[in-house]
Amino acid sequence: LRVATTSLAGCFGCHMAILDIDERLLDLLQLVEFDRSPITDIKHCGPCDIGIIEGGLCNAENVHVLREFRANCKILIAIGACAINGGLPAQRNHLSLSTILEEVYHAQHGLVDGFIPNDPELPLPLDKVHPIHEVVKVDYFIPGCPPSGDAIWKVLTDLISGREPELGHGLIHYD
């Protein structure tokens, strides 16, 4: 089985939680081949069986990466609060984008001639932060901020074994 991971708008804590599988990660590496992930440093995802994605959608580049990633994954797992409901980045959703940009680039004390960047190399921010299921089909959700390594291990080993993943209450928590 091929597994790929990627991160959108978030803190990368969910990828750190994957490392919390600890020595079981070595067992996992005997069962799967990692494609795109920080473990392999592969930047583009090829066809894979299981895709794991963390982070919400804050800008146009996030949406592009998500759609491309989903197109290459037979099964997509949303991992963590940011991917599932927007998480901390979605705290900005009660303000308009123009208000946020004005506050950051013009209203801060000490700014001289502040301007809002308008460079084609920068991804366009979205008006609101969105969870990934609003844009693509998600097959499984692993909640938490971050989810526990045990929850990630349980879902992955269930899928690898052909079982439907089931997380008990003891595996779902927010730290």
What are the residue ranges of the model-derived segments?
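Iron-sulfur-associated redox domains of electron-transfer enzymes in respiratory
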Residues: 1-175
